[in-house]
């Protein structure tokens, strides 16, 4: 993920408002590989900056997604997750006990829709989600 300074410059270049609240969200995402929910980002940001609103967090995440700087994932956990790792192609491991989400490096390629089922369909993205229990929850 880009640095807070790079994201600040990008937002300004695109005519988007840059506020201390948004810069805090940039920083929280930059230092995070846990695929946080928008709500957990809000809780952390609000604890440090009481002027933070949930709407600001949602709007900032939406703008980051529109700029291609984060992916917003629905992993079936009940909350949308924010993935700041857009540089590396990867899939996800989701623990069904604790909800932890980890990146899984893309070690298998070539997954595609069989030609007899395509019927003119063009695949833009493939996301594979493995559900199970993490090491801590398995013990």
Model regions: which residues?
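Non-DNA-binding regulatory cores of transcription-related proteins
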Residues: 66-139
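Pre-recognition alpha-helix immediately N-terminal to the DNA-recognition helix
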Residues: 23-28
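A short acidic, leucine-rich amphipathic alpha-helix
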Residues: 40-46, 57
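Basic amphipathic alpha-helical segments that dock to polyanions
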Residues: 57-67
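Short capping segments at the starts of secondary-structure elements
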Residues: 20, 31-37
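Short, Lys/Arg-enriched N-terminal segment that forms or immediately precedes the first helix
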Residues: 2-15
């Amino acid at each position: 993920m880009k640095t807070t300074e790079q994201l600040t410059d990008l937002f300004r270049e695109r005519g988007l408002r840059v506020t201390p609240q948004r810069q805090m969200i940039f920083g929280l995402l930059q230092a995070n590989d846990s695929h946080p929910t928008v709500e957990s980002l809000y809780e952390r940001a609000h604890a440090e900056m009481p002027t933070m609103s949930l709407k600001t967090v949602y709007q900032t995440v939406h703008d980051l997604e529109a700029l291609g700087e984060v992916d917003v994932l629905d992993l079936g956990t009940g909350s949308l997750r924010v993935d700041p790792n857009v540089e590396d192609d990867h899939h996800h491991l989701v623990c069904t006990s604790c909800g932890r989400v980890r990146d899984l490096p893309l070690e298998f390629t070539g997954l595609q829709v069989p030609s007899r089922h395509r019927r003119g369909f063009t695949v833009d993205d493939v996301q594979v989600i493995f559900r199970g229990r993490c090491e801590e929850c398995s013990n």
